[in-house]
Amino acid sequence: MTRPTTQIFDAAATARLMPYAALVDALRRASIDYAQQRIVSPERLVVPLNAGGIMLSMPATAPDLAIHKLVNVCASNGARHLPTIHGQVMAFDADTGETLFVLDGPTVTGRRTAAMSMLGIAAFAARTPREFLLIGTGTQALNHLEAIGELFPDALVWVKGSAPARAEAFCAEQSGKVRELRPLAEAGATIPASIEVVITLTTSKQPVYDEPARAERLVIGVGAFTPQMVEIGATTIGGSALFVDDEAGAKHEAGDFIQAGVDWARVGGIAAVLGKAQPVLGGPVVFKSVGCAAWDLAACRVARDALARG
């Protein structure tokens, strides 16, 4: 019997298969599925590559779909003028094990990560936000800007970079993705009080945001993914209710919380809020996402459904 050729999608085609609104809905479902053990997503396997690079193996299975993300992270690629991350996400039939399609790994990761932040806004923001601050000017900042542009088209987005020139360049290059895009162009500039959502998107090893906690401002940490990294300082964390996307992974990867010495008994999972098992009482919130393969499975569900519609 002749088997059909497996479809392989590049970065642009992968992005077209997963609009942010659909990703947020899929992540809402997957968060609850994962918490209720309807998705199996073991801790990622990490093996070394040359020059400090790493290979990450991240499988996940559900009754309707199985996926495996394999990505390589090579920090030394900048000197080679190559992307830091390469990889693929493969989707499989959960009954037969046959390969269904292959997606671009960095694109899946970037888009589902931004969509998880948008789900965090839906779960924890006091009201529909109109003003955002993105701290960081890399790929994840771009993914988040695109997500905000799709889901909050009337928003004003501020950008803070590691240097004022970086924020200015980012805003100039990405003009038009949201209604209004402004750099925080002065070093040490005061963060406007009107900002309702702050999203940190760096690989910093010292806090890039440590303001007193405010009930009307949601803080979302994305970039720090090892115990050595920290973006959100102890002042903000100490005054906030704390939530994560993946409770198991966060204990090993959420550097912000680890370095602040948080009591993990007071850290909740987003699934409990989405499932109404744990109410949010209206005070300040920090939501930290670390990611897991269950979220890649959610993205593959979106792609599968898009392909089925043709």
What annotation goes with each model-predicted range?
Residues 151-174:
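NAD(P)-binding Rossmann-fold cofactor-contacting core
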Residues 228-310:
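Adenosine-phosphate binding glycine-rich loop
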Residues 137-138:
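Glycine-rich Rossmann-fold phosphate-binding loop(s) that bind the pyrophosphate
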Residues 1-109, 118, 125-128, 294-297, ...:
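N-terminal ligand-binding/catalytic initiation module
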Residues 148:
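Aromatic pocket-lining residues of Rossmann-like dinucleotide-binding sites
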Residues 177-257:
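Rossmann-like adenosine-cofactor binding region
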Residues 124-131, 153, 215:
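Short helix-loop-beta connector
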Residues 141-142:
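N-terminal Rossmann-fold NAD(P) dinucleotide-binding loop
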